[in-house]
Design a protein with these regions (language model features):
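An acidic-aromatic loop/edge-strand motif
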Residues: 88, 93, 100-109, 157-159, ...
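Short glycine/proline/serine/threonine-rich loop/turn segments at secondary-structure transition edges
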Residues: 131, 171-175, 276-290, 673-680
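Glycine/proline-rich low-complexity spacer/linker segments in large multi-domain proteins
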Residues: 2-26, 35-39, 153-154, 177-210, ...
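Short strand-edge motifs at loop-to-beta-strand transitions and within beta-strands
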Residues: 119-121, 161-165, 269-275, 663-667, ...
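Accessory beta-strand-rich segments of carbohydrate-active enzymes
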Residues: 3, 9-15, 38-39, 53-57, ...
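Beta-strand/loop-rich accessory regions of lumenal/periplasmic or secreted enzymes
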Residues: 88-90, 139, 184, 284, ...
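Intrinsically disordered, low-complexity Pro/Gly/Ser/Thr-rich segments with frequent PxxP/GP/PP motifs
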Residues: 264-279, 644-676, 685
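Extended substrate-binding grooves/exosites of carbohydrate-active enzymes
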Residues: 2-38, 89, 97, 151, ...
């Protein structure tokens, strides 16, 4: 082992020989190159990304001395791409833990067996020319030691922040060598206990910047606006490096590229240039207007894009440029299924474009600063950003003192350093509206000092930190102002809607605006309570917005031993401790395919609201929910459908509606005089022209209304008009035979064993009543109660089966039964009345009594299986994707066609999926159109799959699901909502199946679709 100072366990030594933190910028040699902003085009910039030599050690104690020497032979080492995480390349293993530290909680000490990665990179320097050469690391996890040409240069930590070294004195013309030792853990790891995959290495870009001895080292842009926002002042504070004077010129261009003003000054060490801007075009997330400030010093040209905007709180409301805004946000981690924490620029932009396409206007950089170029994109595309310090000590909660590190004086410097480095690097970005002190670290004096330093440095932004407001630990809403007075907003995670309405808004002692920095945990099939939150947020100005947890499923793309690709989560690599699939909690899949939850969010936070005024006369109310722009960029499209077929449509292209205003529009459709079908009006809003984030015609929002036509009067099918049936009774069964069918009903089990129509058996096993669903991720808490009550292990007990009535045209059989699990009393006692008619129709009427004092039911309905080949689905209900009682705002009611496979949502952890709320009828057929038609006497929930609920319950990953040939159909009276209880409040009562008495009627009819008019059957009813 070689000797090196043990900085990694010394919180008093955070950096050795690093440059002072400063604003991010890249100098260029021409205005054109500066404007394009491709840093590789700058002659002052040299990327060191690429292939490095790499050697991994399980413990730093095994590292041999001399690896950093110029003549060291590293040819036997492996090659590793930088930037990367070494765990993504087979060294060590990815490790997911949410709260728990993966080592004993004994700060500042980390395990003796501390894994180390050694990196060597040779590079060529033509000449030095008495210049400064800065080596920049934009992200290294967790800490690193640096040597250049065999000489120790320095040390640094803070994984998600820039570390910069002036290495000019260590360079020589020709070949040079960098050697870096990265350690998996350091004392700073106690401050980086974020809910994420734990990965190590040089994971962000590495590059050289060559600068003159006297050069601009820092720039601080401040914009000020007068009270009525008609006059702006841009202040540019410039800091020089090199100790002598420099002639600085600055040129300001407006958003159209026209020159507004030019300033020039001779500066010594520091100086300020000011620009007065009359009638500035302001920056906001809807119109992200950016001015261009070119700063010239010698050969260097630096371009900073400047946004004029004013952030303030008045009357307990967050204002941007004097307007109350709603933050429609998400929490975003750096996560890539193949690259880990290494995020290419195009991937950042794709994320942001996808957010814009789904009406998201705000981002919390949970829980660390992002790549600086990410913030440039936020400036340009238009997002409100909460920039969060690289700080979380959640694991301290496990040892009984959540705030122990936040109160510990030996970590004060580390806390301040993380705030310092973030603010200094990111201070010039218009998109940043709040500085966040970190996440889930208790609350202590170290936080207060961070906040006070940031306010002193930059009073133009708000200070955020949620951890101070935990009601059980630190904050009394009645007396807590003094302890948290350094915080500008009241922030909470996952509060219930009732807490927001009945406690926060009613408390007269708390005047700050409320921001939900996390809510609606988007894990798996969910979230299901978005609409309820946003109804309340829109209603109250003090409720300033909310950030969904979280943007993407964190997962590692890997393979099984036999080569099947799958997305891994905690524990799949043998990592301990782990939190399983709790990292799979995003609005998008790891490959950024949207979950249905993202579509739900899009329509709920849409910037246009449509309400019915008088649908008989075509009157609707349109409200512009944008804060700054009118609706001239949108077209209002409308269509009227009858039974799922469009019968009328048009568009209104003149909806130039001012922000936060409403207007009545009259749509020229006709209402039929007689109710001869199901009529629905759909209003949607699409882009007039191409935008940077979406194409012309892209739908921004929609709303659907059922037209007041009245209930369709069904035509009668009399029993007398039907063919006769014969009934044969045996000790075991009832055999019911008609002209085209033969049904066999088991007297012992109380249900059909075959439904044969035209010689084809329509079922492959006996139908059964069911209450179980494969638990969703958001059922993780209620699941324990369900299983304790036996919902997952139901047996059906038949008390009696008897014929209630019969004649030559029909037979009615009543089955008395119960559903229950072992140990517990039955969950349900019920009667099922099965009536078979000469037409082949089966009418099911079930009356169920739910046991008292038990948890609400996951579902209640009939499950049946159809044989192989029944793959084609047609239904009239909410689609085209899955819909639930509390998760349906991204769906609409119409007629849809699908296949069984297409109706399965392949969540990374298998769970309940693919149900369709408020279905009126559905068919499941083979390729010839032969199959079953299901008609609800009242709307029902409909689901088809090649997996049973038990199959899905027992599978940990999709590849473990064994696809059945048969088609499993669930026809449910109701399915409980999905909510967001994996981390949020319990499912709201109105979305629970909690009825004590259930009445459910369903008509089942074998069909050959070519031989019938489907709607004629749907709009018929059997009468005496």
């Amino acid at each position: 082992m070689f000797f090196v100072e043990k900085y990694w366990e010394n919180p008093q030594v955070l950096h050795v020989n690093t440059e002072k933190p400063h604003a991010y910028f890249i100098p260029y040699e021409s205005e054109d190159k500066a404007k394009k902003g491709i840093r590789g085009n700058s002659k002052f910039y040299k990327s060191l990304n690429g292939q490095w030599k790499f050697k991994y050690y399980d413990t730093v104690s095994m590292v041999e001395d001399g690896f950093y020497a110029c003549n060291y032979n590293a040819n036997s080492w492996d090659d590793l791409i930088v930037p990367s995480n070494w765990q993504m390349h087979g060294y060590d293993k990815p490790h997911y833990t949410n709260v728990n530290y993966p080592y004993p909680c004994d700060p500042p000490f980390v395990p003796n067996d501390n894994p180390a990665g050694l990196f060597i990179r040779d590079f060529y320097v033509d000449k030095i020319d008495n210049k400064n050469v800065y080596l920049v690391f934009e992200g290294v996890d967790s800490c690193f030691y640096l040597w250049v040409n065999g000489t120790f240069v320095g040390y640094s930590q803070v994984s998600h922040m820039t570390s910069e070294f002036n290495i000019a004195q260590h360079l020589k013309p020709g070949n040079n060598r960098l050697a870096v030792m990265v350690l998996k853990w350091c004392d700073g790891s106690y401050l980086e206990d974020q809910d994420m995959w734990r990965m190590s290495g040089i994971f962000r870009d590495v590059y050289l910047l060559t600068r003159e001895k006297v050069h601009i080292s820092d720039i601080f842009i401040k914009t000020d606006l007068n009270e009525n926002l008609t006059e702006g002042v841009l202040s540019c504070e410039i800091t020089l490096s090199g100790g002598t004077s420099a002639n600085i010129c600055a040129l300001l261009k407006d958003i159209h590229g026209d020159i507004l003003s030019e300033q020039q000054a001779n500066m010594v060490q520091q100086g300020i240039l000011e620009f007065k801007v009359p009638s500035p075009e302001l920056w906001n997330a809807e119109t992200p207007n950016l001015y261009e400030l070119y700063i010239y010093n010698g050969e260097e040209i630096i371009l900073l894009k400047v946004g004029f905007r004013k952030i303030e709180i008045k009357d307990s409301v967050i204002l941007i440029n004097g307007k109350a805004v709603k933050l429609k946000g998400v929490n975003r981690h750096d996560s890539h299924p193949v690259l880990g924490h290494t995020i290419p620029l195009y991937h950042m932009k794709n994320d942001l474009i996808l957010m814009k396409r789904h009406n998201i206007n705000a981002i919390r950089t949970s829980h660390y600063p992002n790549d600086p170029r990410f913030l440039e994109l936020c400036d340009e595309l238009g997002f409100y950003v909460i920039d969060e310090a690289d700080l979380e000590t959640h694991g301290a909660e496990r040892v009984g003192d959540f705030s122990m590190i936040s109160r510990d004086p030996q970590f004060e410097a580390a806390y301040l350093d993380r705030m310092h480095r973030m603010v200094e690097r990111d201070k010039n970005h218009a998109s940043i509206i709040m500085w966040s002190l970190g996440n889930e670290s208790g609350y202590g004096e170290n936080h207060v000092k961070m906040a006070l330093w940031a306010k002193n440095k930059d009073n133009s932004r708000l200070i955020h930190y949620e951890g101070a407001f935990s009601p059980s630990l630190y904050y009394d809403i009645n007396t807590g102002w003094e302890a948290t007075s350094c915080l500008d907003v009241y922030s909470r995670m996952y509060p219930s809607i009732s807490w927001m309405a009945d406690e926060f808004l009613q408390n007269e002692n708390e005047k700050r605006p409320l921001v939900l920095c996390e809510y609606c945990h988007a894990m798996g099939n969910g979230p299901g309570d978005l609409k309820d939150y946003w109804d309340l947020i829109y209603k109250h100005p003090r409720l300033s917005g909310a950030f969904v947890w979280e943007w993407t499923d964190h997962s590692v793309l890997t393979k099984t031993s036999d080569g099947i690709e799958y997305y891994a989560y905690g524990g799949d690599f043998g990592d301990k401790p782990n939190d399983g699939n709790f990292c799979v909690d995003g609005l998008v899949y790891p490959d950024r395919t949207p979950h249905n939850g993202l579509l739900e969010l899009k329509n709920i936070i849409a910037p246009v609201r449509t309400e019915a005024v008088d649908l008989n006369s075509g009157k609707i109310k349109v409200t512009n929910l944008y804060d700054f722009i009118n609706l001239s960029h949108l077209v209002l499209n409308w269509k009227v459908e009858k039974d799922g077929e469009v019968i009328d449509s048009s568009e209104e292209d003149n909806i130039d509606l001012a922000p936060q205003s409403s207007s009545i529009f009259t749509l020229p459709y006709d209402i039929p005089q007689k109710p001869d079908g199901r009529y629905f009006l759909t209003v949607s809003y699409t882009l007039v022209t191409d935008m940077e984030w979406a194409e012309k015609g892209y739908e921004v929002a929609f709303e659907q209304f059922e037209l007041p036509v009245g209930k369709v009067e069904k035509h009668p099918v009399t029993k007398a008009s039907m063919p006769s049936i014969s009934i044969v009774e045996t000790n075991k069964e009832f055999i019911i035979q008609g002209s085209e069918f033969k049904y066999v009903f088991d007297r012992y089990y109380g249900c059909f064993t075959s439904i044969i129509y035209n010689g084809m058996n329509m079922i492959s096993s006996m139908p059964k009543f069911n209450i179980w669903r494969a638990p969703t991720d958001n059922d993780r808490n209620i699941r324990n109660k369900w299983e304790a009550e036996g919902y997952n292990r139901l047996d059906t007990h038949i008390y009696s089966v008897k014929i209630i009535s019969r004649d030559e045209k029909h037979i009615s059989i009543c089955s008395d039964f119960s559903l229950g699990g072992y140990i517990k009393k039955p969950v349900i006692r019920a009667k099922a009345l099965w009536t078979v008619y000469g037409s082949g129709d089966i009418l099911l009427e079930t009356q169920a009594k739910v046991s008292e004092g038990i948890p609400f039911l996951p579902r209640y309905g009939l499950q049946l299986c159809m044989p192989k080949g029944n793959e084609l689905i047609e239904y009239f209900g909410y689609g085209p994707h899955e819909s639930y009682l509390d998760k349906r705002r991204s769906t609409f009611k119409s007629k849809f066609e699908a296949t069984v496979d297409s109706m399965h949502e392949n969540y990374l952890k298998p769970q309940e999926n693919g149900s369709h709320y408020s279905t009126e009828w559905a068919t499941v057929t083979n390729l010839l159109g032969m199959g079953l038609l299901f008609i609800g006497m009242e709307d029902f929930s409909f689901n088809v799959s090649h997996y049973t609920p038990e199959d899905i319950t027992n599978a940990s990953h999709p590849y473990k699901l064994i696809r059945r040939d048969e088609t499993i159909i669930n026809l449910d009276y109701k399915v409980s909502g999905v909510g967001s209880n994996s981390c949020g409040p319990e499912l709201l009562p109105q979305y629970r199946l909690s009825e004590s008495d259930i009445n459910f009627k369903l008509r089942i009819k074998p069909i050959f679709k070519e031989d019938i008019s489907l709607l004629d059957v749907v709009y018929s009813e059997i009468t005496e």
